[in-house]
Amino acid sequence: MPSSDHWLQLQRNVRFGETDAAGVVHFYQLFRWCHEAWEESLARYGIAAAAIFPGCRDICQVPTVALPVVHCEADFQRPVHGGDDLRILLEPQRLNPGCFEVKYRFQLEDMDVARGLIRHLAIESESRRRCALPEPIDLWLEASTVGRLEPI
């Protein structure tokens, strides 16, 4: 298993097209970045996109569990501009056997500039009923807690 620094700490360069007329990042980009960081984290950990996300090329079997977003929030602490090199820190947390969330911290030169949170719920793809998280996500969540103290 790779070091969690490899799959829970990512980098992103802010592109001009992600900014608005004032030259700062448009608010909705933060949610896109959060989701993309989650996807990249899964890939770096070793989970193929096709195992989690429907519609992937060369998919052998459609995932039987969907992970829709049921809650999201974002806060900007400082303006983020085109050209900024951001560090993204992911903090995944299992909330119960069928639900997890990922907290995201966006840093510029070790200073927090934004935060995001996305919560996912596991549902059966066919019936849309709640279910347990798929095993690859369970393993990813478990691995993310290695070396981290959890509250009692």
Curated annotation (Swiss-Prot):
GO terms for biological process: phylloquinone biosynthetic process. The keyword Transport does not apply. Gene3D superfamilies: Hotdog Thioesterase. GO terms for molecular function: 1,4-dihydroxy-2-naphthoyl-CoA thioesterase activity. The active site is at D20. It is an enzyme of class 3 (hydrolase). Pathway: Cofactor biosynthesis; phylloquinone biosynthesis; Quinol/quinone metabolism; 1,4-dihydroxy-2-naphthoate biosynthesis; 1,4-dihydroxy-2-naphthoate from chorismate: step 7/7. It comes from the Bacteria. Catalyzes the hydrolysis of 1,4-dihydroxy-2-naphthoyl-CoA (DHNA-CoA) to 1,4-dihydroxy-2-naphthoate (DHNA), a reaction involved in phylloquinone (vitamin K1) biosynthesis. Belongs to the 4-hydroxybenzoyl-CoA thioesterase family. DHNA-CoA hydrolase subfamily. Its EC number is 3.1.2.28. It holds the Pfam family 4HBT_2. Disulfide bonds: none annotated. HAMAP family: DHNA_CoA_hydrolase. Keywords: Hydrolase. This is 1,4-dihydroxy-2-naphthoyl-CoA hydrolase. It catalyses: 1,4-dihydroxy-2-naphthoyl-CoA + H2O = 1,4-dihydroxy-2-naphthoate + CoA + H(+).
